[in-house]
Amino acid sequence: MRLCDRDIEAWLDEGRLSINPRPPVERINGATVDVRLGNKFRTFRGHTAAFIDLSGPKDEVSAALDRVMSDEIVLDEGEAFYLHPGELALAVTLESVTLPADLVGWLDGRSSLARLGLMVHVTAHRIDPGWSGCIVLEFYNSGKLPLALRPGMLIGALSFEPLSGPAARPYNRREDAKYRNQQGAVASRIDKD
């Protein structure tokens, strides 16, 4: 069962759930909390690689990722990031989220943006128990026109679901947690699997 707005506010008040900066009550709706777009992005560079062998040797996968992923792009206030049709880009939420070991979160895109062709997450919309950090957004423009994305705009909504008990291996205690405490648009770390 997902938390309702009253429960989300109570969990925030009690410090069991942390969203920083804390959203105003106007952004806590029914069963979700609206989140905004941060100012950090990462894209694929123009490249000539025919493919990335994801099951290849880790050092080769790492080198291929380094060749195709851009450095982090940080926008100044008022600047826009343009996502063209057929392009994939990474970004982050403005908010940093910390979940306890007995709560899982879910990210959903906004219907109004989806109707323009913007996918906010390609597959990864679960936020693990014990997670702490900004949420990485996997943008894809499936529409026909470039989309101007500006830091601070409403980009998605989080919902939260209590678990039957605390997870034995929450994200923040796992040795193999590749994205622990991420604050920026961290590129794929599949080479760390």
Swiss-Prot record:
The active site is at residue 138. This is dCTP deaminase. DCTP binds at residues 110-115, 128, 136-138, 171, 178, 182. The keyword rRNA processing does not apply. InterPro entries: dCTP_deaminase, dUTPase-like_sf, dUTPase_trimeric. Its EC number is 3.5.4.13. Signal peptide: none annotated. Pathway: Pyrimidine metabolism; dUMP biosynthesis; dUMP from dCTP (dUTP route): step 1/2. One of its GO terms (biological process) is dUTP biosynthetic process. It comes from Escherichia coli O139:H28 (strain E24377A / ETEC). The keyword Hydrolase applies. It catalyses: dCTP + H2O + H(+) = dUTP + NH4(+). Catalyzes the deamination of dCTP to dUTP. Homotrimer.
